[in-house]
Amino acid sequence: MQEHYQPAAIEPAAQKKWDDARISNVSEDASKPKYYCLSMFPYPSGKLHMGHVRNYTIGDVLSRFKLLNGFNVMQPMGWDAFGMPAENAAMKNNVAPAAWTYDNIEYMKTQLKSLGFAVDWEREVATCKPEYYRWEQWLFTKLFEKGIVYRKNGTVNWDPVDQTVLANEQVIDGRGWRSGALIEKREIPMYYFKITDYAEELLNDLDKLEHWPEQVKTMQRNWIGKSRGMTVRFAVSDDSKQGLEGDYAKFLQVYTTRPDTLMGATYVAVAAEHPLATAAAADKPELQAFIAECKAGSVAEADMATMEKKGVPTGRYVVNPLNGDKLEVWIANYVLWGYGDGAVMAVPAHDERDFEFAAKYNLPKKQVIAVGDNAFDANRWQEWYGDKENGVLVNSGDLDGLDFQTAFDAVAAKLQSQGAGEPKTQYRLRDWGISRQRYWGCPIPIVHCEKCGDVPVPADQLPVVLPENVVPDGMGSPLAKMPEFYETSCPCCGGAAKRETDTMDTFMESSWYFFRYMSPKFSDGMVSAESAKYWGAVDQYIGGIEHAILHLLYARFFTKLMRDEGLVNVDEPFERLLTQGMVVCETYYRENDKGGKDWINPADVELTFDDKGRPVSAVLKADGLPVVISGTEKMSKSKNNGVDPQELINAYGADTARLFMMFAAPPEQSLEWSDSGVEGAHRFLRRLWRTVYEYLKQGGAVKAFAGNQDGLSKELKDLRHKLHSTTAKVSDDYGRRQQFNTAIAAVMELLNQYDKTDTGSEQGRAVAQEVLEAAVRLLWPIVPHICETLWSELNGAKLWEAGWPTVDEAALVKSEIEVMVQVNGKLRGKITVAADASKADLEAAALANEGAVKFMEGKPAKKIIVVPGRLVNIVV
């Protein structure tokens, strides 16, 4: 055995050993319990970042722990390979997105392998490969035929200069990110998934997810947004019907969760696209201008929430069905046409947004809720409007004095009797629009035929292959300019037809990849029935909290779609979810001449610390001049505070990177990068290596202690007690608690006690062998390379076949225990007594303790309090 720890030598050797033994390559095995561990697959952006390292190390720790515990473990890996960044990089570098993506995959794959992850690379998938997205297209056609996928007009951000549709994140302050042009809203045909058909099941099944963080489930519940309310129809005033047709000429329909406040409505607001707005603007240029303004800018709901609320009156009126009041109709930029009915009733006295709008335009406010005897206070909406328990109606005629529920039911009865409304359950969730007017995505398998309409591509003609030798120019969709792609014949009539040139939202690929891993080479469907039955749901899923809503919701939705197609036999895709925290690091900058900030990498900064170790000043190493310390933030390119994992691996080895990531913080919390923490992790590994080296140097490996320990010295019994209590704790930390930092700390404490114990005797060496063999197995999930190497020196066998250390219950039973002795509540000594010592024996031993005698100062004991197994307190 080499004297010094050399990760550059031992890590490739350990990885080769695992690869040769194929320890990560699994198949269905009914003789073992299965464990499917999955970390969210990466986007192949070019290089791994520390967030990747943390995510995949957590997954590997859990996988290796289960492997040693006899499970048939599947830990696959793949690439979420479609998406906008590839198009942007392609335009920047004049290279096809496919070439850029495949190069990145190869490099990132070597990085992942260098970290020693126990990944079954034979299950690797890349979502941009036709053999993957073929089955996505197949499911799309099946769902289109069933009506779960449908086509309708949707609103998008249109860049009039680049002649292209922009994603919400590409719109910056209302302008295109590349052209700088003012963005317009456009209505174009798009494909949608009827996720709303599954809203109730998606909501209810959250209760099945016992091992998901409550925070994530709450976020999904809020996103689905089930509410009980009423549809209310305001009759259009006779003098306001001009230009309106059908039901729009009869009534304006709104949805409200607070029909009890209907008597407090003082105006109604409609979206710019509402037919009433269009009719009102027919002869009013000022309305036309405002509607045009509303149609410009982002369509993102988040932007709508924060922008300035604006509106114009239409001069049209509707009638409140409860009291006959005429309410003016306003066009408002905060009302969205695609949500609900595109109209809202406004109750300024009891809603903050309505109040601000009414105050801005001097509109009336009418109080209809009172809380106790308090006078109305416009600054307390949450109390007046949100409090459904304590408020009662006022200024509401015969409804006065009613509480929320009674008023709700009374209003519902009145409106229903008039045909002016009915109770309704509504969801915030909207159908999922999956059409993207971009190139680097999965083609939508639809053919447009003038005679037959929209025709799904037959299964035997799938996949519709995306051409890969395309370099986008940012000016519209490349596919729409490629007759060789879109010119085709209709599958129904054989006539000339045109392929759909939109591609799918990249959330589509990540909504089912976990099923494809089960049988990645299966050529007859999305997943083989045998594999789906064996692997079932993912047992452990790991990823960032930023995916709590959309990705996880769509994955749950797809699972139910695939279940209903008979493809899988589970209702939910992920049994247990761990959302790891971010990796954060200090940030530094200097202000530049343009008033902006030039961010400086932490590696280029030299710090000065105060006597408590806190940074007080920083200078740039290159010139010695000051830089601003800006606090810790998530590692990112924009703040230039990232640390390249490859540099860390090259300098310290993969095990040091893994150990630091697992020891620095609990997995669900943010991890603050620390160079000293990395160095500390490396020191511990050197110490572990040195401990085994020194042990073997003194006489080589022996048979580990097992059996009856009655003949051992007290010191060796104490060491075995520490070993087996540590094994029990670490097993719980890995399995139930998933707190890896405390598992590492427990092994460190074990080694501390080992160092203090005399193990020079024959029995001592046997116990030492037992301790060291257990320690390297306990640490193998986290630092597998060094542990694999040390195990081969200690045992000569294959660690992955050794199994998890078992707990010797006899070793946990101590014949003697140490008990604290207090006098008047202050620690004054310790006594060693038999573990089964009686209360009288404990009292006698405490009274005889030298420290107790000294501080009792000859006074008699008034009372003696005994806490069995812990302490004796003498009160004098």
UniProtKB/Swiss-Prot annotation:
It is found in: Cytoplasm. Gene3D superfamilies: 2.20.28.290, 3.10.20.590, HUPs, Isoleucyl-tRNA Synthetase, Domain 1, Valyl/Leucyl/Isoleucyl-tRNA synthetase, editing domain. GO terms for biological process: leucyl-tRNA aminoacylation. ATP binds at residue 637. InterPro entries: aa-tRNA-synth_I_CS, aa-tRNA-synth_Ia, Leu-tRNA-ligase, Leu_tRNA-synth_edit, M/V/L/I-tRNA-synth_anticd-bd, Methionyl/Leucyl_tRNA_Synth, Rossmann-like_a/b/a_fold, tRNAsynth_Ia_anticodon-bd. SUPFAM superfamilies: Anticodon-binding domain of a subclass of class I aminoacyl-tRNA synthetases, Nucleotidylyl transferase, ValRS/IleRS/LeuRS editing domain. GO terms for cellular component: cytosol. PANTHER family: LEUCINE--TRNA LIGASE, MITOCHONDRIAL, LEUCYL-TRNA SYNTHETASE. GO terms for molecular function: aminoacyl-tRNA deacylase activity; ATP binding; leucine-tRNA ligase activity. It catalyses: tRNA(Leu) + L-leucine + ATP = L-leucyl-tRNA(Leu) + AMP + diphosphate. Its main location: cytoplasm. Its EC number is 6.1.1.4. Belongs to the class-I aminoacyl-tRNA synthetase family. A motif ('KMSKS' region) lies at residues 634-638. NCBIfam families: leuS_bact. This is Leucine--tRNA ligase. A motif ('HIGH' region) lies at residues 42-52. Pfam families: Anticodon_1, tRNA-synt_1, tRNA-synt_1_2, tRNA-synt_1g.
